[in-house]
């Protein structure tokens, strides 16, 4: 009897149903969309019917259920929005009044190609976050002969890279660069030059045992290829004003099977580098990862070029673990604040190679390993001219506010726009957008061991002590060891959480080492386990070292309450949830010539069912020793719950980006000059309260010089110039909550502005808004007895007398010529001569406000609220000071830090 098509054998010696190529839903540019999980995989991985990649484990998968109300037809001028949970009456019969995204009108009809669901963040052929999946050509070769047999070959132009120990290529943000022309350029582009798209290989540096954890080397792109070593690409780069390109990178480090250690290799957008955009010639490490200082005698909480290396895994990355692989492959698309880049002023991508587990070896082995890098520009497009489109303006309809007389920082609606229907620069070229913080909370970041002298690993040896665990972690988000994980950084902005936690361990010993470990979770109530036998009475797993060097241990959510507190003042049943302990089950075994110990990287992430609720202000940043350490033991807690892990999904969550930032935050206090309602505007300041402000969440106004005019800064400054633990209150003006937690490189939104006077009374207040780049300064008075802020077509708002409300509120549309704005740091200069501040992009704000009034004693607070917020490309948050032994970070009453003794 004839067989069906599913039972027939295809050209790949498999049935059509089992063959990933023949059953693929789609093929495009060397990638297959596989049927079984609807994820994209590169063709080079689908070469052998016995490969594990045909049926890989999906270790990290974001499952989002429908949240809030679904969209419906617009009847009677109303819209239903699930995040805010209310019905908003739309008085203007227009669903988007503040700014109009022109992305659909930009050059090119095809949308950006993404590869999978979670792949739109940090994905690719291999899940590199919690499982280094071997791409075995012959499994027996590795298991029986201890030889790597994971072959990968890539051809670019007349160059070929080949490796026999690959872990696959990671495609950053799940998107490859398409080579489309930028919509901002009208000239004919230079592209598709075969001699340009090739690998350029060079030595990076030597790796020795002297390098400590988190020492790094930075390689800014494209500048490392802009010289003679860049060949034809460098020549084309030097002859063009603008370039738009993706990057493909392979980093190699050949070591023997008797070497141990691990490197973290990642590609980071807008990563701080040297002013000259040159590759580091030696290994470096920031002593305090809270940003660099431009002047040694000025102190403050942190600078805007901060980098928290405990969260570097938020960037597209792979581990070069000498036990598993000797090469890593990364590919990233083009990202920038504009559709193309002025490369002489800006390095949008930086390749960073960092040590996470130091190099170890035995006597007689090679003491130094060479690190080399092969870099290929992917489909570069060169342009020389720029084309800009003028913006249109339209009048604003006026209506009475339905909540007149009252103002709430979280009122779930939009106020009157100061400009309506304002076109904005297209951003359809951008990739790496995420809409829920849980997407990146599921990316493992490093746990600090041996706090306060923290390291990202624990150590195992050839002895197994039953009463001495390798690690003990409290199952609470306020545990001191988690202080610099992204999971804890995100959670500090919320009051309560629910769901499981995932602890990930990566063994970095030599390839010749074997051993077993026991990982246990013990609920509270009976104290933490003091021996391995006690730990085995609870939930545990045995990890056997093999080809897979990593293990993920999920801690189930077991609680007497539906939600648990993120922070803690005193340990109780609503915040602490037991311990995770790691024990050595058997001693490490190895042949002669191997090191006698090995390091295990430790990371944590959110589980699939993890959720947070009730956004709050983040905790103060500076450390204060005010309270003794907590024991971390709770009493009278029922520890007899079922340990079988069950998902605890919620139908909705409050971690969506648009919802989280849709609330007002203050940027500082301001004042007016007496009698300025009837005269020309003049810069003025009273008690560090100026009469103008740039609309941006970043810092401005230099307190050391008592500036009268607003000026963007790259650092946040406090009350004095002395370096003390107490730097508050801040003298610079900024949205401190935004600066403290903005885990993204770029953002785009409209801005709701609210002015709230400190006192009521009979006074007049005039506010003039100048869009970004407005050339005129409102200083010259043209009309007699009329303020210079009132003249012309520039939008203005006037309030006189006490009325029914003291607040002034309006929405400013996104009006920068940039397609997106840098959230924290711009790794470039404004000017062609590369002078001035490094870190502030040109016109990267929402304009400027000028104030005039009748009385000099009027003071008011300016609030910013981010409407229609979109964010792109995850990045680390601010470094959180490790608690010292016997102390904890004072975060009362919002959050606390538990210490282990």
Swiss-Prot record:
GO terms for biological process: symbiont entry into host cell; virion attachment to host cell. The keyword Methyltransferase does not apply. InterPro entries: Capsid_VP4_Picornavir, Capsid_VP4_sf_Picornavirus, Leader_pept_picornaV, Picornavirus_capsid, Rhv-like, Viral_coat, Viral_lead_polypep_zc_finger. The record marks 137-138, 393-394, 624-625 as: Cleavage. A lipid is attached at residue 68 (N-myristoyl glycine). GO terms for cellular component: host cell cytoplasm; T=pseudo3 icosahedral viral capsid. Gene3D superfamilies: 2.60.120.20, Capsid protein VP4 superfamily, Picornavirus. RNA binds at residues 22, 46-50, 69-70, 93, 95, 97, 100. A zinc finger (unnamed) spans 10-22. The keyword Lipoprotein applies. Pfam families: Rhv, Rhv_5, VP4_2, VP_N-CPKC. GO terms for molecular function: structural molecule activity; zinc ion binding. Keywords: Capsid protein, Host cytoplasm, Host-virus interaction, Lipoprotein, Metal-binding, Myristate, T=pseudo3 icosahedral capsid protein, Viral attachment to host cell, Virion, Virus entry into host cell, Zinc, Zinc-finger. It comes from the Viruses. Belongs to the picornaviruses polyprotein family. This is Genome polyprotein.
